[in-house]
């Protein structure tokens, strides 16, 4: 089915208000969920909203909590999210990293005791729109087996890198071949994954999203490489924030909350003049996209460039929402 941005935001806002979230916070949170969905990231927008409400009702998310600065070391700051709303706090933390970068050339905010930030790409994009390189990542509850294991002991720990090119170039990727949100999107659409995304119960690689969702044997991105990246990202976020690791979140908490996150902004214009920056970025993009195609019908894409097109299409034609997901939201 198709809905407008306004309908989507109003539905989110209604549910948040009914759960006792104050009107200003509810409006800002509903706006972020709707913007994420409008950008085409359904897995961490509309599809994720019922799960967000469940955690709100369980007390994992404290809607009136505000992040608190713990330590300041010039370009580096350490904050405690105090289990506040994840996407609103993440936006504030990237804003703070940008402020630090304006003063120091680079800004790093390490956040502990946080909640799921929903679409991580929002915060990298936020920095790139202002002319900064944006880098951020988060740890999570253990939802992926380390390479060679059958049991989940590491997080998908998504990493975002956004570059202020025209259009913005951005990688937003979990350390698994697919996020669990994208497994859900493909399952709801009745599609197999385009490439192997995990193992079945017999230990064979599979493209069946429902099987992987059930047995949790999701495949690390690049096999052992994604497994290794997940581990070191967790270590850095844990140390810099003095927060909880994947092991602590998984073993000590009843659900995924109290996680650790990193937000970095770099002011490019302190290092290179604008015309030179733009020319260098354009040359990189042209060099990549003019490579001989393996399939003449398949364009060579640059990461993140599709979001401008998706956003325009959704604004023009309406936002596609799975019927079953919309029914869940209406029933909340």
Swiss-Prot record:
Localization, UniProt: Cytoplasm
Active site (catalytic residues): 44 (proton donor)
Main localization (coarse): cytoplasm
GO cellular component: cytoplasm
UniProt keyword Ribosomal protein, yes or no: no
Residues annotated as binding NAD(+): 168-174, 224-225, 304-306
Keywords: Cytoplasm, NAD, Oxidoreductase
MF GO annotations: 3-dehydro-L-gulonate 2-dehydrogenase activity; NAD+ binding
Gene3D superfamilies: 1.10.1530.10, Hypothetical oxidoreductase yiak, domain 2 (3.30.1370.60), Hypothetical oxidoreductase yiak, domain 3 (3.30.60.50)
Catalytic activity from the UniProt record: 3-dehydro-L-gulonate + NAD(+) = 2,3-dioxo-L-gulonate + NADH + H(+); 3-dehydro-L-gulonate + NADP(+) = 2,3-dioxo-L-gulonate + NADPH + H(+)
Nucleus as UniProt keyword: no
Function field: Catalyzes the reduction of 2,3-diketo-L-gulonate in the presence of NADH, to form 3-keto-L-gulonate.
Subunit composition and interactions: Homodimer.
Family the entry assigns: Belongs to the LDH2/MDH2 oxidoreductase family. DlgD subfamily.
Protein name: 2,3-diketo-L-gulonate reductase
Species per Swiss-Prot/TrEMBL record: Escherichia coli (strain 55989 / EAEC)
